A protein has these predicted regions:
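Extended amphipathic alpha-helical scaffolding segments in membrane-proximal extra-membrane regions
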Residues: 1-132
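Hydrophobic alpha-helical transmembrane segments and their immediately adjacent juxtamembrane loops
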Residues: 107-176
């Protein structure tokens, strides 16, 4: 279904088609990883395991880097196709068919660029959600520490009232 391989132009467009397909596959796989990671972030088990949220944040970072690299590749391919389109020889007998294939590739690139923008937004959501869950865990920890601090408040208050002034402590004159 590709352009064929009987001439250099057709081989070039066939290679471009394959590169675009592989970039689309990378984006699809990255989207699946992001979906899985978000499911794990929002699962009840992740709130009990801080290491799971840290691992999720690392996976999100890795996918973000991959998406950025795919975006850069798409921009480079767009420049290549723009240059090729501007310099294409129209003397070939089937230049109309090649132009149609070229336009199709350019539309595919445009669609994938929009998809990478969407994926970048999803990465942003995933990072925000993960950091929010980490913040909730920290709130739970601070709540426990606040209760413990409140338990030690009365002895601390007594110690701060009397301080180290042993002559003013009435308990020293108590009989045993």
């Amino acid at each position: 279904s590709g352009p064929g391989c009987d001439r250099p132009d057709r081989i070039f467009l066939g290679l471009i088609e394959e590169i675009i397909a592989r970039l689309a596959d990378l984006l699809e796989a990255s989207g699946a990883v992001l979906d899985d990671t978000l499911r794990q972030v929002f699962s009840p088990q992740s709130r009990k395991r801080p290491a799971a949220l840290q691992a999720a944040l690392e996976r999100i970072g890795t996918e973000s880097d991959l998406i950025a690299r795919v975006r850069l590749s798409l921009l480079s391919l767009e420049r290549v196709l723009t240059f090729y389109s501007a310099t294409q020889q129209s003397r070939a007998a089937d230049s109309g068919k090649l132009k149609a294939i070229l336009k199709g590739h350019q539309r595919d690139l445009q669609a994938l660029q929009e998809h990478t923008d969407s994926m970048s937004s999803r990465v942003s959501l995933a990072v925000d959600a993960t950091i929010g869950m980490i913040g909730l865990q920290q709130n739970d920890t601070v709540r426990v520490l606040s209760v413990v601090a409140a338990l030690f408040l009365p002895p601390t208050l007594i110690a701060s009232t009397y301080g180290m002034n042993f002559q003013r402590m009435p308990e020293l004159q108590w009989a045993y």
